[in-house]
Amino acid sequence: MGHTQAKSTTDRRVEGGELLLQHLAGRMIPPEFSGPITTAGKFPTIQHVMDHIDSVEELRTLQAGGHWPEGTARRLGLDQPRPTPPPITWTEEEDKKAKEFFKQYQENRPKPAETAPPPITELHAAEPPQWKISPEDPLLKAKALIPVKEPEVPILKVPKLTNKKKMGATFGGILAGLIGLLVGFFLLTKILEILRKLDWWWISLSSPKEKMLCAFQNTGAQTSPHYVGSCPWGCPGFLWTYLRLFIIFLLLLLVAAGLLFLTENKSTIFEKLQWESVSALSSSIYSLLPSEPKSLVALTFGLFLIWTTSSSVTQVLVTLTQLATLSALFFKNSG
């Protein structure tokens, strides 16, 4: 394939002028005309003539403005309506003369007078006015021109309310009494249960399993066969059972009193029982306890609820937790 030469700007202008002339000529000649096309057309009407005059005026306007001169000349049959002027060239002598003239002009050019800038005067900040007023100033002693009247506020006397007995206080006292009775009955039941378990453990250590039946069940009133420690009402062993429970309760009180005595005196015997480990355990439990009394009551009540609805193993764990909590509270109050 051959390479086509790139069109110059002049050629592009010529083509643009021809396209413009064709567009203007299309306005003079109707599109259905199939005869030879000339500048004036064939068999022109008065409308064609007027369009031709308008087109020629537009061409003259474009030619006068210098737009597409070569394309306009080719369309109208003119060779060179405006010959291009020859390019201006400089000879070496003229170039040297121009450079020398410019050099002399720069040397002989008068220099602008250098004027020193005016000195800047130092501006000092004005001293702030003194707004202090002495106590003897007459402005302080002068009275206001407009008298100030205090607004009169009506005083409303509120009648005293008579102290009426509310039903809520009475109901609250009754409810508190019922809750106290419920808690006391619950504690009594749990204490008896713990004492019976200790009694059963004591009897199991002292007698074999074959002799666990009550020995008094055939001596008194006719009762069904039962074990020692669970004697019903009417059996002679009933009193002995509660006597043993009372003795166990006294022993527990004695042990508690001894512990209190040892903790108050901090004797050497209690120190041998690893006082530091016990105090560390109690302090760790105390750090986990809530500080508010309501939270402590809620915690204790929750432990009691777990006790009532759990198995024997869980009851043992809850009992140990309760004892640890009570001991921590005791050490807190004593410390």
From Swiss-Prot:
Regions of this protein lying in the Cytoplasmic compartment: 2-241, 189-241, 317-335
Segments in the Extracellular topological domain: 2-167, 263-295
Enumerate the InterPro entries for this protein: HBV_HBSAG (IPR000349)
Q: What is its main location?
A: virion
Provide the site residues for: Cleavage.
Answer: 243-244
Where does this one sit in the cell? Virion membrane
The segments labelled Pre-S in the record are 2-166
UniProt GO cellular component terms: membrane; viral envelope; virion membrane
This protein's superkingdom? Viruses
Function, as annotated, reads: The large envelope protein exists in two topological conformations, one which is termed 'external' or Le-HBsAg and the other 'internal' or Li-HBsAg. In its external conformation the protein attaches the virus to cell receptors and thereby initiating infection. This interaction determines the species specificity and liver tropism. The large envelope protein probably also assumes fusion between virion and host membranes. In its internal conformation the protein plays a role in virion morphogenesis and mediates the contact with the nucleocapsid like a matrix protein. Truncated S protein may be involved in translocation of pre-S domain through the virion membrane.
The name under which this protein is listed is: Large envelope protein
* Species annotation: Heron hepatitis B virus (HHBV)
User: What's the name of its gene?
Assistant: S
